[in-house]
Amino acid sequence: RTTAPSPVDLRKTVLELLASSEKPLTKNQIARELGVRGDERIALKQLLADLEEEGKLDRGHRRRITVADRPFAPGHVIVAEIIGVGEDAELIAIPLDWTQDAPVPKIELLPSRRSDPRHSALSIGAHVLIRLQSHTKNIWRGEIIKKLEKTAKVHLGIFTRNRDGSGRLSSCHRKDTFPGARLSPEESIDLQDGEIVSYSVSVTQGTKIQKRIGRIDNPKTFSQMAIYAHHLPHTFSEEAIALSEQGKIPELGKRTDLRHIPLVTIDGEDARDFDDAVWATPDEDPRNTGGWRILVAIADVSYYVRPGDALDQAAKDRGNSVYFPDRVVPMLPEALSNELCSLKPHVDRACMAIEMILTGDGKVKSHHVKRGLMRSQARLTYTQVQQAIEGNVDKITAPLLETVIKPLYGAFKSLLKARIHRGTLEIEQPERQIIFGEDGHIDRIIPRPRYDSHRLIEEFMIAANVAAAHTLDAKGWPCLYRIHDAPDALRVANLRLTLRKMKIPFSKATSPRPSQFNELLAATRNTPLAQMITDLVLRSQAQARYSPLNIGHFGLSLSQYAHFTSPIRRYSDLIVHRSLISALQLGNDGLGDKSVSLLSVADHISATERTAAIAEREVMDRFVTAYHVPHVGEDFTATIVGVTRVGLFVAIKDTGAQGFIPRGNLRGDTFYHEEESHRLVGRRTKTVYQLGSLLEVRLISADITANSLIFGVAEDDDTPNKRPVRRQENTSRKQMKKIKKPRRNR
């Protein structure tokens, strides 16, 4: 029996399963392999029918299903995206999934079909099912079978006014292939140069402005751009807000009273939602010498967010909170996330808690899940706790040092032993932190400090997450596992090949263990190659995701793992809480049905998590680009992190910013690319630009709109044969003389 890949989305998972199967499968076999039950079978049946109609699946003997192997040829059916209108008013489309090396072909949808109702109100960006008919050179003709999208795709654009009064909407992302749109003087009369808008383009209605977002020279616009570009839900319905404001602290009732335990929260200085609290004390059992009793208490969000209500639907749609440098797009309204579900000090709060008994080596001897009422003793920060354990106490940490903080560190050291024994993958990716000046401009960008206090909380959370997964397994209740597959053999082979060309040794194992990746990282940690090797290892790994089917967590070296500790900001944790409530009979507001399928939920929240990560990275990069605008013309120390035929990718040492040096900006010679050795070599001077090398670079352009930094190589003024690099005019530089700090909304 073939093991199906764990679902990231059902469509992709079905195709991967059938592609990996040695023989055709029936619909029932597919359902069993993917764990599809109940109403989910209806969705699976419809999906299989859609995939067959799209030409991606074939049915053979006894209606057994296989992946179709069809070339791009007349008579075949494909999914395409409409990208424009031709000179004769015909629609122009391109294949949606083009994986061939040849140029992407354009497809004309025949003008004779314009009267077809299937053409009415078709929007540029819409997906359609097309039957290919004929072609000349790289132009095909095709017939629309059906429309696959009901609504026009919304694009994000920056407005530029032309001399004749008309305007142009251009893409705000360098990877966006959409050609943009032209606006007449009448359509653009209210718009200003540099204004960001969301818009749709329809064949029948033309260009329609959906939302005026702000100007590119205003940093408040950066987060808004990501919100609209990635379609992040950011407002709550009146019903959801009303429900959040009706909530009250529950009576003790059947809950466990934990208010006498000195639990504390430990978070960043700028945190406003505190969803986890911790406590530890030495285990008094003489049979467990050196052991610990620890408690992890988590906000009881499930008490306020009931299955199917408006709050639940809003949280599910979002999947998770999204964190930008200047604001948070919360999963729940602030009345919950910053108030009733925030474990503020000295006030009663409903909680779900897991008590664990640890051995001196950090192994969990036993665990017990409770639904309780707690009262946090203090709101501490990572910096405070770290300074306290190092001997620098303040008025808050001084009375807690012996009774609370030192026991926490004692238990942490035990948990750390267990982590080391498991051989957890240790990838440290430095986070950047934007520091704003008093007048609101971006003062500097620094690596975010990382202390043992951060690791302490991480280890306590991991222990609680494991205990939650074990509990649901033991009780036979559904669980949304947090899974991480072992690296794909092809990715490992590519990593090994890259390292071999750089003469860096690595394990010859087909499936390396986390400890073998750690050896590679340790060997290069204090070298200029460190960040590049970390990135290579990270890219070789599978992506962690959610699934009701457990395959374990490779990176953490755990056989069972779930997310339990952040229900304020992750819907997965809320589902785990509900399942625990039902499994342990802790209330009537749990998951309810033991046979419920979590496949579609896993699919959805895995997707929202990926979208959030992309949006967060995009906004951070835009802030970093904006910071560099006043520094155009200055020199920086950089590391070469990528070598291509057309130039070098570099990372700035001080800010972590990444940019590009076009090959034409490499002065004094012409350079050719040695692909296997990852370097550019000068034909005359034999100057070498090698992957991982340090060099001084000069910032040539910082483009906030395209979110890109262009560099040249810095040279002394008396360098012979110096070819000057022309400093590119940058309108963003003029617009960004001072960057104001948007008001925080965390």
PLM regions with names:
Residues 1-295, 302-347, 379, 384-387, ...:
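Charge-lined substrate channels and their catalytic hotspots, especially those that engage the 3′ end
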Residues 1-8, 74, 670-680, 713-746:
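Acidic, low-complexity intrinsically disordered tails
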Residues 86, 95, 171, 359, ...:
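Acidic/polar residues at beta-strand termini and the immediately following turn/coil
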Residues 92-97, 168-173, 649-654, 660-664, ...:
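Short, acidic/hydrophobic/Gly-rich beta-strand patch recurrent on exposed beta strands
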Residues 101-110, 176-183, 656-674, 724-725:
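A short macromolecule-binding patch
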Residues 189, 201, 215, 225-232, ...:
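Electropositive polyanion-binding surfaces
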